[in-house]
Each structure stands twice: as C-alpha cells, then as structure tokens.
Amino acid sequence: MKKRSPIVAGYFYPDKPGELRSVIEWSFKHGIGPGKPPSPSDIPATNSIGYVAPHAGYIYSGPVAAHVYFDMALNKKPDTIVILGTNHTGLGRPVSVYPEGVWETPLGDLVVDSEIGRLIVENSEIAEFDEYAHLEEHSIEVQLPFIVYIYGEDVKITPIVIGIHTPDIARDLAKSIYEASMSTGKRIIVIASSDFNHYEPHEETSRKDSMAIDRILKLDTDGLYNVILHNDISICGPGGIMTLMEYTKKLGGKAQLLKYATSGDTSGDYSHVVGYAALKFYI
C-alpha cells in the first residue's frame, strides 16, 4: 500500500511519539486552549459536520486547533474525515484528491478512503486524482496527529488540496462531497485547514479577521470572497472554508466560533502575527 510520509514532523510538531503527545496535551491545557484534554465524562457536543482549524507550528496554533479536536472528540466518531488543505507550493492540479494509500504520522497511520475520493472526483467538474500537490504540502499533514490522538487509527481520511479559491469551485466541491456522503451513508466530517490573516500587527490582523469571521458565521460564501478580496485579508485557505460553508448549507446547518487568537497570544510577539480561528459547523 502506498505511503505518504510526514514532511514537517520535527519542524511544525515533534517527530517523536512521546514528545508529540506531550505537545498535543500542552495545546489542550494551554490558557488559549480548551483547558484540558477531552474525556469520556465531558458532555456530548452538538452534531458536528465540519470545522475550520489552523495549520501552523503547534507552539503557535496548537492551542486554537485544540478547540476543534476537543469538540470533535465529544461527537460521534466519523467514518471518514475529508480534509481540505490549501496549496502553498503551486504543485499539482487545481483541486487534487489523494487517490489511495496511507498517511503516516508519528502516532500512527491513517488509511485514505478511496471510495469517498472516487465519488468526489466522479461528481465534481474540477476535482482530479493527483498526488503531486500533496507531496510537499503541510496543511493537511498538520491536522493528522490531533486526529490520531483523539480517534487512534480507526478513522479514514480523504485528503484534498485546493489551489483555486473561488465560490464556484467551492460550490462544485461541496456538492461532490455531499453526494459522496449521501450515496454511501457514511458519517463524514469536513475539516477546512486554514490560517487567517498573515504578518501584520495583532490589532490589524484581528480587525481584518473579524470581518471574515462575520461572513463565515452567516454562511455568506460570496460575502467572504468579496471581503477577503476588497480588504486584502491574507487567509491562506479560503477555498476550503467556502467549500465547508456550502456543504453546511446543503445540510441546513449553522456555524459557531469556538476560539480566535493570534500567534502573538502564544508567542508574546504582537508586531507581526498570524490569525488563527477554530470554527464549528453543525446541524
């Protein structure tokens, strides 16, 4: 079986299992995080269908990401997690679906759901099978250790890298994910992996991000696209976020902000920050 090895283990997060578990638990316990790791005694959450999660180094964005995985752990385990990454490298096709195989992490391996991937490609006008876009891309990989931490290896993934970020492509991809879910009856959670505004002072980044988050919470896909464009908001994964918004609308769902912070809140340097948001989509 084809294996995709980690490319940012040892950089964005530790490459040794014990150290990685410790950093994930630090993220849960951090003051910016939920305060503790999830446990069976916690009250079950609403029926989640997706999340927006950041993908920076864990020392910066881990506590915000932990809000996503704390909430996810309180929901019924999905059969498959569709992870929408963003194309930082320029490699591969415009919308690249990883076809089959295993993604390795220091905590365990996750099998690709080739059935869901095939149905997404068949039902989409733009999505294609392509491994090339995934080879050097970190935005999906950074989510996987958190997934293995809460679920072990007993969940499948469908990795998709998005290189063109428009509402029309988001609608096409959302439709294909929805049809794949309906035709298989599988419980799917969609994770849109994205950081928010980049490399401006904390106050300006927070101001810009609040405009984008307002559109996201209203599930206003065209509004999000326009506010990003007209206000120069450097969100790196808007295509995945818009896809999740459109998918949520197909299911009659809503959006909720779990946590917002910037890298300044974890690093102490507020002069040039990156914004991080944990958002939940549910029915």
Curated annotation (Swiss-Prot):
It comes from the Archaea. It holds the Pfam family Memo. CDD domains: MEMO_like (cd07361). InterPro entries: MEMO1_fam. Gene3D superfamilies: LigB-like (3.40.830.10). Belongs to the MEMO1 family. This is MEMO1 family protein DKAM_1357.
